[in-house]
Design a protein with these regions (language model features):
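Charged DNA-binding/catalytic regions of mobile-element recombinases
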Residues: 1-322
Length: 322
């Protein structure tokens, strides 16, 4: 190209120069020379922005394990809305939903989708049932006012494992969980004790007479041992109607997300579940993510722990200027 430029500077025509070069076996078109001489065009702002967003989405959606393997991270489960909120919180405050959508489509990310759920709770026939104190109102003015409980199953090579959860309605925080190979009363008693202990450990102990424990009509929750322990702790029992998932809709939603985000992916456990210990390992990772890093749309795209901390921070009297 420099040779052609020198010849042009001496007054020769580009077409003539290129024709002579082609006759000598050098295939150069006049259009190629003119394109080479043309000043480079500035890259469009959208192309630059899309590249930045795509890099940020890739970094958020995949993580490198200690052994150097690239794996999908929990944030890779997000759809467009939550991925946009995540990037605005962490890497790109001005990230647009459109740019995130384009980046996710380019990278083959679409978020996870909920599947069907299977009924695992058998109504208690002999247990005395408490009334429904919530009437499908899954809101609370503060933490430790309403807890919801339920359990689900996970298939393993050794048989079924059952995982019971307790979530605080105020910020949807999972305050306790327990996995076992049988669905006896201990399956739900253990997380209840753990939840009470954990709240005390956080210096946010349950106050007698202030908390409602809501569940479905399963025999584990209507068992005498369970209801007596609630009474001992000053916790009011609440039981939804038989066979109606909407009466415990919040907990059904939590369990549905547990199945979708944890059980049916390899994000929190690589490979099949061989025993209950594998289920415990995966559940521990998912609950930690749920409480501390997962963004919740119903909370304004913050985490349950952030929502609780904001609540307690608002209760601290602000210093008045002198």
């Amino acid at each position: 190209m420099a040779f052609i430029a020198d010849q042009v500077a001496q007054g020769r025509a580009v077409e003539s120069i290129c024709r002579v070069l082609r006759e000598q076996g050098c295939q150069v078109a006049a259009r190629t020379y003119r394109e080479w001489r043309r000043p480079s065009r500035p890259v469009a702002d959208r192309i630059v922005t899309d590249a930045q967003v795509q890099d940020a989405v890739r970094d958020a959606a995949w993580a490198t394990s200690p052994d150097g393997v690239r794996r999908l991270a929990p944030e890779g489960l997000y759809g467009r809305r939550k991925m946009t909120a995540h990037l605005r919180r962490t890497a790109l405050p001005q990230a647009s939903a459109g740019a995130v959508d384009r980046a996710m489509r380019t990278l083959g990310l679409a978020g996870v989708r909920r599947g069907k759920t299977l009924r695992t709770t058998v109504p208690g026939k002999d247990g005395t049932r408490a009334g429904d104190l919530l009437d499908r109102n899954f809101t609370a003015p503060a933490p430790n006012r309403v807890w919801v409980s339920d359990f689900t199953y996970v298939r393993t090579w050794a048989g079924f494992a059952y995982v019971a959860f307790i979530a605080d309605v105020f910020a949807q925080k999972i305050v306790a969980w327990h996995a076992a190979t049988t669905k006896t009363t201990d399956l739900v008693m253990t997380p209840l004790r753990m939840a009470i202990w954990q709240r005390s450990r956080e210096d946010r102990a349950v106050e007698p007479g202030q908390l409602i424990s809501h569940s479905d009509a399963g025999s584990q929750y209507t068992a005498l041992r369970f209801t007596e322990h609630l009474a001992l702790e000053g916790i009011a029992p609440s039981i939804g109607s038989v066979g109606d998932a909407y009466d415990n809709a919040l907990m059904e939603s939590v369990i549905g997300l547990f199945k979708t985000e944890c059980v049916r992916t390899t994000v929190f456990h690589a490979g099949p579940y061989k025993a209950v210990s594998d289920v415990e390992y995966a559940t521990a990772g998912w609950v930690d993510w749920w409480n501390n890093r997962r963004l919740h749309g119903t909370l304004g795209m913050i985490t349950p722990n952030e929502a609780e901390e904001a609540h307690y921070a608002a209760l601290i009297p602000q210093e008045q200027p002198v």
